[in-house]
From Swiss-Prot:
Listed GO biological process terms: glutaminyl-tRNA aminoacylation; glutamyl-tRNA aminoacylation
Species in which this protein is naturally found: Buchnera aphidicola subsp. Acyrthosiphon pisum (strain APS) (Acyrthosiphon pisum symbiotic bacterium)
Subunit structure as annotated in this protein's UniProt entry: Monomer.
InterPro entries recorded: aa-tRNA-synth_I_CS (IPR001412), Gln-tRNA-synth (IPR004514), Gln/Glu-tRNA_Ligase (IPR050132), Gln_tRNA_ligase_bac (IPR022861), Glu/Gln-tRNA-synth (IPR000924), Glu/Gln-tRNA-synth_Ib_cat-dom (IPR020058), Glu/Gln-tRNA-synth_Ib_codon-bd (IPR020059), Glu_tRNA_lig_a-bdl (IPR020061)
Principal location listed in the UniProt entry: cytoplasm
Enzyme class, UniProt record, top EC level: ligase
A cellular component term, taken from the record's GO annotations: cytosol
Lineage: Bacteria, Pseudomonadati, Pseudomonadota, Gammaproteobacteria, Enterobacterales
Motif 'KMSKS' region mapped to chain: 269-273
Family that this chain belongs to: Belongs to the class-I aminoacyl-tRNA synthetase family.
One Pfam family hit: tRNA-synt_1c
SUPFAM superfamilies named in the record: Nucleotidylyl transferase (SSF52374), Ribosomal protein L25-like (SSF50715)
EC number: 6.1.1.18
PROSITE patterns, A to Z: AA_TRNA_LIGASE_I
Name this protein carries in UniProt: Glutamine--tRNA ligase
Amino acid sequence: MDTKKEIKNNNFICQIINKDLNENKNLSFYTRFPPEPNGYLHIGHAKSICLNFELASLYKGRCNLRFDDTNPLKENIKYIESIKHDINWLGYKWHGNVRYASEYFLKLYQYAQELIKKGLAYVDHLTKEQIREYRGTLNTPGKNSPYRNRTIQENIELFEKMKKGDFSEGEACLRAKINMSSSSIIMRDPVLYRIIFIKHHQTQNKWCIYPMYDFAHCLSDSIEGITHSLCTLEFQDNKFLYNWILKNTSVKHYPKQYEFSRLNLEFSILSKRKIKILIDKNIIEGWDDPRIPTLSALRRKGYTPSSIKNFCQKIGVTKQNNLIEFSMLEHCIRKELNQTAIRTMAILDPIKIFLYNLDSNYKEEFIVPNHPNNPEMGTHKIIFTNTIYIDRSDFKEKYDKKYKRLKLGEKIRLRYSYIIHAEKIEKDEYGNISNIICYCDLNTLGRKPKDNKNPAVIHWISEKNTLSAEFKLYDQLFNIKNPEQQENFLLYINSKSLIKKFGFIEKKIGEEIQKKISNNNIEIFFQFERIGYFCIDFIDSKKNQLVFNRTVGLRDTWDSKKIKTKNITNN
């Protein structure tokens, strides 16, 4: 995948950048990825990360990592470390040191003082509820705060008192003085500073007043020399305030904001608030539960950095909000794993087969490829004995003409091995099949049977070549395509989003995995033949009990000839 070429050819933002660079030959492209450290990154953030870092590489520019840490109530060091890890995992490196908006708090405070001295900001004592009430609606203009027309000197003194901690939380705030009748609600005297008495993870207890995101963001962009500030469409109206603040302060550099559509993914919730509800109600295990699209969850499910970057490249960058097919994301990882995953056999729901014409000490070894189309990936040994396991779904007791696998009185070929014939069954006290008695035709290794009819092929594992394992079969968490739009999204939980199976993998393969787990070499991917692509669950696996997560099934349902997206209003 030539990501740079794809970006240059298909990205409307590139057209803007090309124009800017052509008009100003001395301009160097400079962008940033500015997450708030109040949660874990998800697939939507990956789109922004890929866009910013790939553009910086394409234009030989720079991309900063800046944490917009202006709300210590919701922020945590663990989110900072997780975000840095995710960006590195995707294969990107930010320019220079990690930056924090909190590094600029003194400078931001000085810019706020400038606005006060120009009569463009005032200290207000309305409560949060009163401010909301005074702001008006889309159809009705707002009304001025009774504190709006204080003198400049009074506002200077009050803002200094806010900084010193002389007011309690909610008792005072600093607001921009713009226009309470503006058609844009965001321009109706927005709050610029509020009081929060809590220890900040970077500045400790140095500050008790904190700038709002809209105030800190544009000024931080300016301080860092950002040329193109890229954000999603929900910040489109914020651009009015972004430009107003820059225009009315003494900044020396004027970045430009451009918006693109956010990533909306079928059957998924991206809202941090809603994901937390799912966790609190024990519907999912945590932020890395493979049923949600956080990057840590996708990593645990078996998605690779290249598959996620390929997905972001395929969906492109537009100004139209669309609902992206989940099958496109699956297509990207399936296509990669088809080339790279080791082939092996696993039995998820075992049923025993006894081959009565073979001795109990019968043993035969077969050398099988790790990948059918890539000899360089090597081979491994499997053994064949008189007792083997197949998957319960590969046998049917009652005759069914359409059923092409093993059934009583019929034959089947074992993968890489012989043809067997099912003659009778044994059941336990509950009526469940416990044993299938079969005849093994030893003249059929690599040969057709006497009737010249090749039967279907199923996978198997010798009883003497098994290692027990748990298999987690993940499906969509929701049973509707756009749960984000539902008022009560919890009504649409898929009760079968996780099914656990307990079975076997090939012993030698399992032992190799156990060695790698102890060495923390945990990115191990397999195609369990006829089942799907799986990875080792590096969180739940123990040395004596391996756990595998299904990454994706074998069948590709996405039409790769055209990118299918759906209007986000459709369910």
